[in-house]
Amino acid sequence: VTFSILSVCTGNICRSPVAELLLAQSLAPFGDVHVASAGTGALVGSGVPEQAQRLAAVEGIDATAHRARQIDTAMIREADLIVTMARDHRRLVVEALPAAMRRAFTLRELARIADAVETRLPQAVADAGASTPEQGMCAAIGLAAALRGTVEPPATPDEFDIVDPYRRSDETYARSFEELRPAAYKVADFLTKAARAASV
């Protein structure tokens, strides 16, 4: 059984494809994980801008083959986890499919929750009866959803968002990437720990 992740931003050319590829690269060794991305207002068929490609390359990621696509309800329905680049995208996802509420987080929000709840992961995985890496990852998302309301919010809600660098300066691309990268790795680490806990 595959654990599927959908990464969402606006155009599906800067933030969500880079998050998709970072997560896919980090999680590939730990289970059958399928990561995809889409945009709420996608520049369909467009590639990743050169600035974002260069930043991704630093992490060993080749983003040249990516082509933007528009999100649809089926993609949301099929995903075990939806990570969005900003609160607006999360809202649009949940409006499109209210049942996705428990599976939809902004990337930085989920990273913050993961930080606060990861000590409870082994118990959550055991309570869920998870015996495969993919079931462990599902248990991790269940835990994050259940405890979302108990995690102290950031000083400003903007800290849940990753800045959109499209058509902006190289500095903005760099800032966007610096917001995205640690959050993606934190989420990957959280899911990896859950996968390992289930496989023990």
Predicted regions and their residues:
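Conserved active-site segments centered on acidic
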Residues: 1-79, 87-102, 189-199
